[in-house]
């Protein structure tokens, strides 16, 4: 969540820091218990920035979790107070930017998702990469592949959950069989005619589609139509993980004629390359329902109104902001865009706005006034400072 910010991919092998931790990790598993059997229920979901949020009640308090199929288990942020966490030890976790850390694993107290009580759910305890009000953590794909099927309907802001194995057996739609890698779902989509690519379905990513640099290079070498759909290249970084941003690198900008999910075609898709894995993200759910059927290992896309195609015609952001050492940094700037013309360049660190020093979190929550001009104090990679006056909001994307 890759994105932009990616989902946490958990590598399930123990880090033996001491004998007590090792003993705990030998008992660590991803199973959890449900309070009901043979059920079908519909729960409300919230859609914010195109992503899905679930409200749960735990220890008498409401918590709000992002539903992230690119995460295997989930996360509870370390600044969120929760009584009754059970510490399980440490595992090694790798984020969207390819950086890894040892992170604490904890078991949440029982929590209620509508009328369903879930007990024994394990998550990682870690700091948040981007501060967002009203987001306490992440619920990952384990919610489904451990025995719950679901239908996500963002148009009506509801999600159907069931433990009945055959409930979605006769469901219509474009079904893709998924393969679990690192406990998250990968499917084959077609970004170019005659070519398929295995990608992560990552509902935690705000990008409709992102393609790995090396994957694109291999396709370009064998498929003539790929070069025609390249708009240009730039340099920078635009994926943020839980442990930091990816390193600056070449980014290829693409205007795809089509992106095919089975028999459904998304037309005029603007996207770009990433250093991490290729993925298809939350914006897919703007165009239809999605059924997650863990019993048949299928993701079934149901286009709204039964269509076989849609025109996306999405706009690429002029500028992308990432975090570096606690500050907001220009991760990528599209040459010729408004941000480029204003003087912003990749790897410039934003130190002040109107003379006020800002951390990354403060920049992220700054109360911008539309069409107002601001003075930005920037630190260049060579160490010198400069100032730029620009109207905000610039068009930027941040996970």
Give residue spans per PLM region.
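Bacterial Sec-dependent N-terminal signal peptides
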Residues: 1-28
């Amino acid at each position: 969540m890759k994105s932009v910010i990616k989902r946490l991919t958990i590598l399930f092998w123990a880090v033996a820091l001491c004998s007590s931790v090792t003993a705990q990790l030998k008992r660590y598993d991803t199973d959890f218990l449900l309070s009901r059997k043979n059920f079908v229920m519909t729960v409300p979901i919230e859609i914010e920035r195109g992503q899905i949020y679930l409200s749960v009640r735990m220890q008498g308090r409401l918590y709000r979790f992002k539903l992230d199929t690119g995460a295997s288990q989930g996360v509870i942020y370390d600044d969120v107070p929760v009584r009754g966490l059970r510490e399980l030890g440490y595992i090694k976790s790798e984020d969207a930017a390819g950086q890894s850390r040892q992170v604490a694993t904890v078991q949440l107290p029982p929590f209620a998702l509508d009328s369903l009580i879930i007990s024994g759910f394990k998550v990682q305890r870690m700091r948040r990469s981007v501060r967002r009000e009203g987001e306490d953590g992440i619920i990952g794909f384990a919610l489904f592949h451990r025995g719950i099927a679901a239908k996500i309907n963002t148009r009506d802001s509801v999600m159907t959950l069931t433990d009945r194995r055959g409930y979605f057996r006769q469901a219509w739609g474009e079904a893709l069989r998924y393969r679990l890698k690192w406990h998250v779902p990968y499917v084959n989509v077609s970004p170019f005619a005659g070519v398929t690519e295995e990608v992560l379905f990552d509902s935690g990513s705000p990008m409709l589609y992102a393609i790995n640099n090396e994957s694109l290079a291999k396709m370009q070498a064998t498929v003539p139509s790929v070069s025609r759909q390249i708009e240009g290249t730039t340099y920078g970084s635009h994926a943020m993980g839980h442990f930091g941003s990816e390193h600056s690198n070449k980014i290829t900008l693409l205007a795809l004629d089509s992106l095919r999910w089975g028999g459904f075609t998304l037309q005029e898709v603007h996207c770009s390359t990433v250093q991490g894995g290729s993925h298809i993200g939350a914006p897919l759910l703007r165009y239809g329902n999605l059924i997650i059927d863990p019993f048949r290992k299928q993701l079934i896309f149901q286009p709204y109104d039964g269509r076989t195609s849609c025109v996306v015609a999405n706009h690429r952001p002029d500028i992308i902001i990432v975090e570096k050492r606690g500050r907001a940094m220009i991760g990528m700037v599209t040459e010729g865009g408004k941000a480029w013309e204003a003087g912003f360049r990749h790897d410039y660190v934003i130190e002040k706005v109107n003379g006020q020093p800002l951390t990354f979190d403060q920049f992220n929550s700054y109360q911008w006034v539309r069409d107002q001009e601001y003075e930005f104090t920037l630190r260049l990679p060579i160490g010198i400072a400069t100032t730029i006056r620009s109207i905000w909001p610039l068009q930027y994307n941040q996970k």
